[in-house]
């Protein structure tokens, strides 16, 4: 594979450049269109950039990204790929229920938290504690909100 992903060293509070990847580009393009509309409506479009790509072309992206978020249907492709190919940028598997929520705040919060976790352990894909069994993940809110809700129970 051609390694052409540009990595933007993300710092907390910075703008966030996100690449959302799916198998054929269809569901990622729908998600990105919806999220970009939410960014525009909330006034955050100048602060964050979200784009999409097909799984097989994610290495050819020219924009510098802080994080790559993989749609749930790419899970099996990720398992078959050489994970050592991507070491310098966090790869985050979007939980299935979070993926269908189409809510920008949830995606941005998970993006920030995944970047922060990746900086501490440099493991790809990024899984939050207790979510390593990816296909069993039923979370539909951001991980930080999920954690807060568990504390309040």
Regions found by a protein language model. Give the residues of each.
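Gly/Ser/Thr-rich loops at beta-strand to alpha-helix junctions
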Residues: 23-29, 74-76, 98-101
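Structural signal for conserved beta-strand scaffold positions within catalytic alpha/beta enzyme cores
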Residues: 20, 52, 92-95
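Short, Lys/Arg-enriched N-terminal segments with co-localized hydrophobic residues
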Residues: 1-15
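A short, well-structured beta->alpha microelement
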Residues: 42-60
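Glycine-rich phosphate/pyrophosphate-binding loop and the adjoining helix
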Residues: 141-153
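Short, structured active-site "lid" loops
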Residues: 61-84
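Ser/Thr/Gly-rich flexible loops in soluble cytosolic domains mediating phosphotransfer, phosphorylation
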Residues: 89-141
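Short, charged N-terminal beta->alpha structural module
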Residues: 13-43
């Amino acid at each position: 594979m051609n390694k052409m992903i540009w990595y933007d060293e993300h710092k907390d509070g910075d703008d966030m450049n996100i690449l959302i990847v799916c198998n054929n580009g269809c569901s990622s393009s729908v998600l990105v269109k919806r999220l970009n509309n939410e960014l525009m409506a909330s006034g955050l479009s100048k602060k964050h950039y979200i784009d999409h790509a097909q799984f097989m072309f994610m290495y050819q992206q020219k924009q510098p990204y802080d994080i790559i978020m993989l749609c749930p249907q790419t899970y099996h492709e990720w398992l078959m790929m050489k994970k050592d190919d991507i070491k310098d940028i966090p790869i985050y598997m979007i939980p299935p229920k979070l993926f269908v929520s189409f809510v920008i705040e949830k995606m941005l919060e998970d993006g920030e938290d995944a970047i922060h976790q990746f900086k501490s352990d440099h493991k790809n894909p990024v899984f939050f504690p207790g979510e390593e069994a990816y296909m069993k993940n039923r979370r539909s809110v951001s991980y930080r909100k999920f954690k807060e809700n568990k504390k309040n129970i």
